[in-house]
Amino acid sequence: MKSALLLLSYGSPERIEDLDEYLKNIFNGKPVPESVREENLRKYEMFGGRSPSNRIIESIARKLHEKIGDDMDVILAYKHWNPSIEEAVKGLGSYDNIVAIPLFSFYSQNVKDSYLNPLESALRRYGFSPRLEFVNGLANSDLFLPMWANIISEDASEDSFYLFDAHSLPAPDREEDYLFWLRYSTYKISQILGLSRSDFGFQGGHLGWLGPSIYDVLNRIDASKITVIPISFLYDHLEILYDLDYEFRKAVEAKGMHYRRVRMPNDSAMMVNMIERAARSAITHLSGEKINGSIIGQPRIADTDNGR
């Protein structure tokens, strides 16, 4: 039986010259508003013309190959860059088992719509019918909370307010599980580390999306320091380096507060181990009885209701 681990992520251009093609992919071929193009051009120019995300994900893939390469091939695919999900699927015809893991912390319908649906559609178009497990969110792993607790504790400060940050999503009525995992993770990590002052907020949202925004939280707290924990993300990219470390930092410092952000898991040993464990667990599900249907990650509320 031949198996593959398909690592899925958003993707980013390798060169600033590729930005227009990248934005065209995001807008599904529709005209890109000039204001959006200029904003993204400014961001990429600030960071040398590229995001660090692709290199981090490639490093994760290499390290996973060293650990599980004898059992499954590790394949990369991006939602908005190359190789695309469609391109990756072209090479999956010889595989009996496929474990697909989008590199996100929390279960969400948005991830399902954006990654699982295109993956299944592409498999059907090519006439492939492997056994497929889709790991929707890595917060279900027993390594997730210890990983973040370890990162946060590296430079903990009793006089800091801890802001757990997540990417906002549309259609809040469809994202109860996403909100559950954010609340649960905030609660459990604060409990583990004894953080007396903490809350969560969202970034990148629009009217009617999940809230409150991190700016709303900032405006109602009184502290000399704020520590940001981008817990819905797993690796560095421009939404962290620009939106948080540049834009949000300015708002924090304008209130006379000190801004600090914890490091990201990136390609650390705990991160790689967490993905490896999720992949091996999914292969076990494929070879035996499935748990929670074909989508792993959805919370079993009876097991974790005390975190609501």
UniProtKB/Swiss-Prot annotation:
Protein name in the entry: Ferrochelatase
Keyword annotations: Cytoplasm, Heme biosynthesis, Iron, Lyase, Metal-binding, Porphyrin biosynthesis
Gene3D superfamilies with a match to the protein in the record: 3.40.50.1400
Molecular function terms from GO: ferrochelatase activity; metal ion binding
Subcellular location: Cytoplasm
Family note: Belongs to the ferrochelatase family.
GO-annotated biological processes: heme biosynthetic process
Species per Swiss-Prot/TrEMBL record: Thermoplasma acidophilum (strain ATCC 25905 / DSM 1728 / JCM 9062 / NBRC 15155 / AMRC-C165)
Positions with a binding annotation for Fe cation: 167, 239
Residue stretches in coiled coil: none
Gene: hemH
EC number assigned by the record: 4.98.1.1
Catalyses which reaction(s): heme b + 2 H(+) = protoporphyrin IX + Fe(2+)
Gene Ontology CC: cytoplasm
Presence of the UniProt keyword Glycosyltransferase in the record: no
Biological pathway: Porphyrin-containing compound metabolism; protoheme biosynthesis; protoheme from protoporphyrin-IX: step 1/1
UniProt main location, coarse: cytoplasm
Pfam families named in the record: Ferrochelatase
Superkingdom classification of source: Archaea
Function according to Swiss-Prot or TrEMBL: Catalyzes the ferrous insertion into protoporphyrin IX.
Class in the EC hierarchy, top level: lyase
